Amino acid sequence: MLEYRKLTSIEDPLFAQMHRLMQEVFPPEEVLAFKLWEEPLRDPGIQVFVAVSDGAVVGATEYRYVPEFRVEMTDFTIIGRSGLGIGRFLLKQREKHLRELAAASGAESLGMFAEIYNPEDAAGSLSVRGVLPMHPAVRREVLSHLGFRKLDLDYVHPSWDHEGKAVRGLDFCFRPADDETASLPASLPAGFLRWYYAALPNKPAEWEEMMKKLEARESVALLPI
């Protein structure tokens, strides 16, 4: 049976297992250094949970609900083994918790943001390693089924290794609460991205250029993935 366990300290042995799992499936520029996790894990607004089977971390997810923007964000989902129903388990537990967080804030969610690898991009296709469920093409199709669509912009984000590199190979996506939503006011993703990446001191010129273009727009379309 899978257990859903919250992580709040880098001293938790389960965190060391999760961090190793991240290093196995994500490229180095997407993985925050071990010691730099100490502050995020203490942040009550950041939710980091692991799926545990017989004492071993077999999956993980990080997410948040941001009342200021009335949006959710899934930072990552990791499925470490096939055949255990880990993806479904993490999804159901996360959705339940996010509904509780939104209700507690008194602000109904407009939807969820997520960065999704683009398997047609050579860099993105080679970026994620590990078990088959973590293959970019598999993940993207599953997320499409869940209702995610990509924002119409040439997306780039700052690297999480604090070196200020521009990371490509992903699309910035949104799953609207109202499935009929065809576009977003540009101020929503622009404001959210400024807030989300404020924690990283070094940002590449490519990211700043993307943000300026986004902030100059009135709206941004949601396209199929």
Residue locations for each model-derived region?
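Conserved acetyl-CoA-binding loop-helix of GNAT-fold acetyltransferases
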Residues: G83-E100, S109
